[in-house]
UniProtKB/Swiss-Prot annotation:
It comes from the Eukaryota. Belongs to the complex I subunit 3 family. Keywords: Electron transport, Membrane, Mitochondrion, NAD, Respiratory chain, Translocase, Transmembrane, Transmembrane helix, Transport, Ubiquinone. The gene is ND3. Pfam families: Oxidored_q4. The keyword Transport applies. The keyword Transferase does not apply. The chain crosses the membrane at residues 9-29, 62-82, 87-107. It is a multi-pass membrane protein. This is NADH-ubiquinone oxidoreductase chain 3. It is found in: Mitochondrion membrane. Its EC number is 7.1.1.2. It comes from Triticum aestivum (Wheat). Core subunit of the mitochondrial membrane respiratory chain NADH dehydrogenase (Complex I) that is believed to belong to the minimal assembly required for catalysis. Complex I functions in the transfer of electrons from NADH to the respiratory chain. The immediate electron acceptor for the enzyme is believed to be ubiquinone.
Amino acid sequence: MLEFAPICIYLVISLLVSLILLGVPFLFASNSSTYPEKLSAYECGFDPFGDARSRFDIRFYLVSILFIIFDLEVTFFFPWAVSLNKIDLFGFWSMMAFLLILTIGFLYEWKRGALDWE
């Protein structure tokens, strides 16, 4: 248990700092009435043309999530490519299995029409 002490201390300190940083604004925030202009979106000195908090199409979120997933795939491939001459066949085939799983997922999303913009 002693070998985990630095990790536990780090987690406790991180939690305390996070809670302090979240709580300090509540101590110093003023309770004065706010003006509606302060709550509206600022558009370079002009009156806002419309509501800045409009809804986005769900396809934007889907495309962004797919981008993050495949961007992480590339992030995993860089260290693998650098150490390719040092790993054995198990490392090679495990990364090929990882690539196959992600390719199957990509083909599934493509077949379901997640990438079609209608």
